[in-house]
Amino acid sequence: ISSAASDVYKRQAYVVADYCGGLLSPQAESCQERVRIFMENLNLHLQQQGYLDTVLYDPSGFDMEALTTTLDLKEVVYRLLEYSWFREIVSQNTYTATLPDGSTQIWQNTNAFLDPTSEYYNENVCGIKTGSLSDDYNLIVLYQQHGKEFLICSLGSQSDSSRYDDVNFILKTIDESYYLTQ
């Protein structure tokens, strides 16, 4: 995401949080109060859904104080993988969404494992997500091999390329596993 696109995304997230906070608490008078109410309710919802180690502070997701665990990430991804529309979207290098007004929005997946022109392209990777904040580079990969699916959560790699190298090491181990071929 470019800096300008990131700023637009952040503003949109705050507009949605402000609106939802107003629905949750019509008496809230300021945008700041409505966003706070939204975030409190979002965190309560996460707890009720069983994501006990996740706390979010910024509706945009650009939050250096947010906390989560690989266990919570795994649970979220497993729930989402139950939906074919989710699998379809995250498995593509680019995805074109048709919006309610009939216009289209093209999303570029930043997962280099899905890009046929990338040195990291791997036809057995079924997608999911990249992410980075500050100097932490993260990657969640769904991998199919030996008739099985593997969910790999790699957090805190040192660079964009090292996150792919880190996961490639795991993929190679899966590919070469005698145990998994039995």
Name each region found by the language model.
Residues 18-182:
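Penicillin-recognizing serine hydrolase domain
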